[in-house]
């Protein structure tokens, strides 16, 4: 919704309908699509006694118990080492790619590598390097390099051109360093810090497929019903991420990275014959390997009917439902985190809850919910909506704090509905569309937990050593994600959606 005029501020009048048409229509269609998807979704509660399991989890949360200190320190060290090394490689590669981001082929390459989830990359590299440090490093570095290249490239493009023109006689590299890079540096550092937090969460999730991070011990404790130990590890994870502002210092980063390289060298026992066979034979469709081109059509048709189409459909269904409930929860949670609506104590409590929800990865939340309700789309919907709505609600609350209100502005629900929401609705949609791509990626990967999205069929293909099927399904997942990214950018452009707020 567009910003209300200065005359209407404080009057609690509904803005004119003409300014709302396109945004209302977009919101309505997304809600309608989510409603249709709900009719197709499997949201059955399969667990025979979820309340008993919930009670056991609650008891574990209030009586945390640590695993052995050796396991805890090992998990922490590996988690930090994977994140630091992966981000170091991603920053260097992302920066180099950002310098060439104006070229379409660079943008396409970056879009492709970031469209593949880090867990899918890990499953690929496990076949090549086993459960080694190199697998974890590459699984983090590749998709994050694509993401950082995009953001860095856009930051460089958005810097004012006047300073660069003023240095026409300077060398190109010098001009870039003293203009574009210098102007973009604060935002670049801020975003890199945020991505490191994301890398910590991703590294934890790599433990769920066997790498020795905190997630490995957390998955073991949850699977065996040791909820007190799981709670202890959960609190360590929350403390690790929440305390970043104190221990993540620029001056200490070289020291951290050096220690990470010593503790966990990025090595692997590489069998070059196996590696060559994987990329030159194993991922090639079986009919083509057998020089049987006539059977390629039936092979592809079978894969489409049995795995590709059901996987794509369920991924789309899950992501659209999760997107809708993300929007709904974000709009409901935002007022409880904004000083325009609540007192300081309520705001602090709300901030704490949102911090927990956005700190815990969707995969972990879905895993816990799956233990309660069984393998349906319901755990995934709840996990995706909780995590992403917490991120959006926190940002919307920050936007609302910059708004100026008249002394006679209305209060309560009217203030929210007619004063604040119309002025931040464009920003809300912008954030929602940014998260759409993330939700799509996560919807695919949650199939590893038993939900019939693309991740379910990809994981099954790896377990059956059908790497050709896995490669094609991963390619489909990447293309689906790239299509959603293009659609989201198109909608943002056509609706003139921005992330700056009218503070008048």
Language-model regions, residue ranges each:
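Hydrophobic positions within alpha-helical transmembrane segments of bacterial inner-membrane proteins
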Residues: 83, 87-95, 99, 119, ...
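Generic hydrophobic transmembrane alpha-helix motif, especially the helices
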Residues: 113-144, 354-385
């Amino acid at each position: 919704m567009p910003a209300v005029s200065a005359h209407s501020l404080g009057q609690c009048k509904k803005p004119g309908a003409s300014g709302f048409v396109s945004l209302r229509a977009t919101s309505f269609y997304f809600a309608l699509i989510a409603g249709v998807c709900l009719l197709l979704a499997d949201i059955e509660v399969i667990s025979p006694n979820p309340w008993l399991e919930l009670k056991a989890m609650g008891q574990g949360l209030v009586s945390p118990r640590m695993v052995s200190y050796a396991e805890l320190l090992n998990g922490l060290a590996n988690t930090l080492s994977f994140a630091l090394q992966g981000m170091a490689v991603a920053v260097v590669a992302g920066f180099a790619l950002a310098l060439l981001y104006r070229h379409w082929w660079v943008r396409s390459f970056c879009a492709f590598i970031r469209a593949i989830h880090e867990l899918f990359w890990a499953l690929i590299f496990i076949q090549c390097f086993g459960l080694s440090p190199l697998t974890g490093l590459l699984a983090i570095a590749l998709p994050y390099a694509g993401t950082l290249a995009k953001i860095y490239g856009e930051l460089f493009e958005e810097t004012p051109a006047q300073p660069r023109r003023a240095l026409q006689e300077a060398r190109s590299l010098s001009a870039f360093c003293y203009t574009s890079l210098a102007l973009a540096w604060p935002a670049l550092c801020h975003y890199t810090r945020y991505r490191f937090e994301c890398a910590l969460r991703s590294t934890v999730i790599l433990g769920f497929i066997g790498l020795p991070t905190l997630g490995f011990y957390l998955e073991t404790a949850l699977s065996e019903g040791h909820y007190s130990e799981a709670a202890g590890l959960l609190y360590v994870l929350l403390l690790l991420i929440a305390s970043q502002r104190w221990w993540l210092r620029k001056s200490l980063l070289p020291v951290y990275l050096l220690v990470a390289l010593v503790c966990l060298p990025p090595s692997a026992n590489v069998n070059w014959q196996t590696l060559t066979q994987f990329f030159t034979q194993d991922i090639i469709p079986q009919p083509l390997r057998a020089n049987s081109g006539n059977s390629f059509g039936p092979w592809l048709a079978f894969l489409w009917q049995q795995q590709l189409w059901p996987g794509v459909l369920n991924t789309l269904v899950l992501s659209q439902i999760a997107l809708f409930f993300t929007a709904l929860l974000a709009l409901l949670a935002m007022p409880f985190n904004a000083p325009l609506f609540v007192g300081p104590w309520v705001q602090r409590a709300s901030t704490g809850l949102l911090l927990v929800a956005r700190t815990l990865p969707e995969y972990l939340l879905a895993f816990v919910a799956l233990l309660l309700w069984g393998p349906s789309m319901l755990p995934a919907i709840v996990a995706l909506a909780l995590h992403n709505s917490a991120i959006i609600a926190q940002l919307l609350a920050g936007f609302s704090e910059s708004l100026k209100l008249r002394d006679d502005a209305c209060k309560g629900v009217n203030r929210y509905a007619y004063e604040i929401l119309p002025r931040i609705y464009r920003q809300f949609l912008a954030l929602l569309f940014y998260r759409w791509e993330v939700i799509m990626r996560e919807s695919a990967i949650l199939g590893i937990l038993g939900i019939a999205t693309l991740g379910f069929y990809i994981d099954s293909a790896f377990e059956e050593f059908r790497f050709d099927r896995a490669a094609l399904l991963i390619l489909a997942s990447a293309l689906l994600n790239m299509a959603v990214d293009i659609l989201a950018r198109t909608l943002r452009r056509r609706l003139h959606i921005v992330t700056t707020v009218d503070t008048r």
